[in-house]
Amino acid sequence: MAGLLKKTTGLVGLAVCDTPHERLTILYTKTLDILKHFPKHAAYRKYTEQITNEKLDMVKAEPDVKKLEALLQGGEVEEVILQAEKELSLARKMLKWKPWEPLVEEPPANQWKWPI
């Protein structure tokens, strides 16, 4: 449907997506699946899950691409797809990094004090 409405995004290097609803649904679902592996208390899981669910609900509720772009407030729908891809990539990295675990060693006493 997006291909019928516009021929270009107007952004260099960013091609028009013919199936933005399908693409966003897949990306948001994959992100939510990865977040299920995080502990429930992890801040990244809590807030990313909330935002991703809100965006997924918008994608499911609004069939018109232009209205969806306005709802998501992320620019062109292709830019939103790019953001969703980056969030999925970050979620995978965060799962590997495990930032919710305690530090391996204690930080120096005045690490965050400035000026020293």
Curated annotation (Swiss-Prot):
The keyword Protein transport does not apply. Disruption phenotype: Lethality around embryonic day 9 (E9). Conditional knockout in the central nervous system does not lead to any visible phenotype until mice reach 10-11 months of age: then mice become lethargic, lose motor control and have difficulty maintaining balance. Defects cause loss of other complex I subunits and reduced NADH dehydrogenase activity. InterPro entries: NDUFA5. Coiled coil: none annotated. Acetylation of Lys-98 is observed in liver mitochondria from fasted mice but not from fed mice. The modification N6-acetyllysine is found at K30, K36, K46, K60, K98. Keywords: Acetylation, Electron transport, Membrane, Mitochondrion, Mitochondrion inner membrane, Phosphoprotein, Respiratory chain, Transport. The modification N6-succinyllysine is found at K98. It holds the Pfam family ETC_C1_NDUFA5. GO terms for biological process: aerobic respiration; proton motive force-driven mitochondrial ATP synthesis; respiratory electron transport chain. It is a peripheral membrane protein. The modification Phosphoserine is found at S89. Belongs to the complex I NDUFA5 subunit family. Complex I is composed of 45 different subunits. Accessory subunit of the mitochondrial membrane respiratory chain NADH dehydrogenase (Complex I), that is believed not to be involved in catalysis. Complex I functions in the transfer of electrons from NADH to the respiratory chain. The immediate electron acceptor for the enzyme is believed to be ubiquinone. This is NADH dehydrogenase [ubiquinone] 1 alpha subcomplex subunit 5. The gene is Ndufa5.
